[in-house]
């Protein structure tokens, strides 16, 4: 029996994608091979690879000024790879810290430069807001400005993206990429692990403006140097072939759904239903300012936290899984990525109301 999976990542995949992958597992398109067995330089995998790159460009409307790369290491690795590729001769990078992941990025950058905290969304209640651009205090000559546009743990999503002029804007988009249209031209670099909205764990997407490819530090490993990866069409070393294949199937699924505009409308509907349920109750609480609440990751707390384990057990009995909040913040978290259907959110909301009544 399939359940409703609210995991923050690795996360739910579209059932259509899983079924297609199952059908093609032993024999991809008459090749007599599984994608797992293919040479990454053979014509069969090259067709998968090129189609995935092209479909991602189409979905995000990536301009010709930017390169799309497939790497490995996830968002965590990019916290080191970004400074190694962008610092050049500069010694400072600016960070807008809106949650746990941008804090990790800030901390990792200390190994390579002197990071400057340009703004923070931390309050007495934790990370609950995204500082407006007017609050940002940028340094004099930063190599780049970094932000995480959706904080998976804290549930803070940044929607207003400023124009920084000549300063490259770097965004960790791991947990909301492909959930809504984006103006890619505003960014110098976008990066994200695949295991939330793109596909399965193993591949990392990097979209980088081409004029930024000449800034890498000499210590940057060649496999992570964007210029080298770009020059080799993301095939400098053996890529995560099956993860790219699954990502390609997800891209095709998204196109069949009507693209990112249609997906965004669905995601708004799902998020509104869940937040309205939380806000309409004194039993559940979300601490994030409404204007910057994440559409993808919805943390919430029970007024009586002694009931947390009962809540999770009851949810599991109804086929609602992976609702436990991150260990650093506690409570609950429902990750409602693209592949989580509206029916899943409706089932969760119904359970939340039933549980509240039972506890009254």
Curated annotation (Swiss-Prot):
EC nos: 2.6.1.52
Primary subcellular site in the record, as a coarse category: cytoplasm
A Pfam cross-reference name: Aminotran_5
UniProt pathway: Amino-acid biosynthesis; L-serine biosynthesis; L-serine from 3-phospho-D-glycerate: step 2/3; Cofactor biosynthesis; pyridoxine 5'-phosphate biosynthesis; pyridoxine 5'-phosphate from D-erythrose 4-phosphate: step 3/5
GO MF annotations in UniProt: O-phospho-L-serine:2-oxoglutarate aminotransferase activity; pyridoxal phosphate binding
Residues the record lists as binding pyridoxal 5'-phosphate: 101, 152, 172, 195, 237-238
Transmembrane segments: none
Residues found modified as N6-(pyridoxal phosphate)lysine: 196
UniProt keyword annotation of Oxidoreductase present: no
Cofactor note: Binds 1 pyridoxal phosphate per subunit.
Keywords: Amino-acid biosynthesis, Aminotransferase, Cytoplasm, Pyridoxal phosphate, Pyridoxine biosynthesis, Serine biosynthesis, Transferase
UniProt-listed GO biological process terms: L-serine biosynthetic process; pyridoxine biosynthetic process
Residues given in the record as L-glutamate binding sites: 41
Cofactor: pyridoxal 5'-phosphate
GO cellular component: cytoplasm
Keyword Amino-acid biosynthesis: yes
Function according to Swiss-Prot or TrEMBL: Catalyzes the reversible conversion of 3-phosphohydroxypyruvate to phosphoserine and of 3-hydroxy-2-oxo-4-phosphonooxybutanoate to phosphohydroxythreonine.
NCBIfam families: PRK05355.1, serC_1
Name by which UniProt lists this protein: Phosphoserine aminotransferase
Organism: Burkholderia multivorans (strain ATCC 17616 / 249)
Lineage, opening ranks: Bacteria, Pseudomonadati, Pseudomonadota, Betaproteobacteria, Burkholderiales
């Amino acid at each position: 029996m399939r359940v409703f999976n609210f995991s923050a990542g690795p996360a739910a995949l579209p059932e259509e994608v899983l079924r297609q992958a199952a059908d093609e597992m032993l024999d991809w398109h008459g090749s007599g091979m599984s994608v797992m067995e293919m040479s990454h330089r053979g014509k069969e995998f090259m067709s998968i690879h090129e189609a995935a790159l092209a479909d991602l460009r189409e979905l995000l409307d990536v301009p010709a000024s930017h390169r799309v790369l497939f790497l490995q290491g996830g968002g965590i690795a990019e916290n080191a790879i970004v400074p190694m590729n962008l610092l050049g001769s500069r010694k400072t990078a600016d960070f807008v810290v809106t949650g746990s992941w941008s804090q990790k990025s800030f901390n990792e950058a200390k190994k390579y430069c002197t990071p400057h905290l340009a703004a923070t969304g931390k309050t007495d209640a934790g990370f609950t807001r995204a500082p407006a651009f007017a609050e940002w205090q940028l340094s004099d000559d930063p190599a780049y400005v970094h932000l995480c546009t959706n904080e998976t743990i804290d549930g803070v999503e940044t929607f207003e993206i400023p124009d920084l002029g000549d300063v490259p804007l770097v965004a960790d988009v791991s947990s909301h990429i492909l959930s809504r249209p984006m103006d890619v031209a505003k960014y110098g670099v976008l990066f994200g692990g695949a295991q939330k909205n793109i596909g399965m764990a193993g591949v990392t997407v990097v979209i980088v403006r081409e004029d930024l490819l000449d800034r890498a530090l000499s210590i940057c490993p060649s496999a992570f140097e964007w210029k080298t990866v770009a020059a080799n069409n993301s095939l400098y070393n053996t890529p995560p072939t099956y993860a790219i294949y699954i990502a390609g199937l997800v891209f095709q699924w998204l196109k069949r759904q009507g693209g990112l505009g249609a997906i965004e409308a669905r995601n708004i509907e799902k998020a509104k239903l869940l937040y309205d349920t939380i806000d309409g109750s004194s039993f559940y609480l979300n601490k994030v300012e409404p204007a910057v609440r994440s559409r993808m990751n919805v943390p919430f707390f029970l007024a009586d936290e002694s009931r947390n384990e009962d809540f999770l057990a009851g949810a599991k009995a109804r086929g609602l899984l992976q609702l436990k909040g991150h260990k650093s913040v506690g409570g609950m978290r429902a990750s409602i990525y693209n592949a989580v259907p509206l029916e899943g959110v409706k089932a969760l909301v119904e359970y939340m109301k039933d549980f509240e009544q039972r506890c009254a």
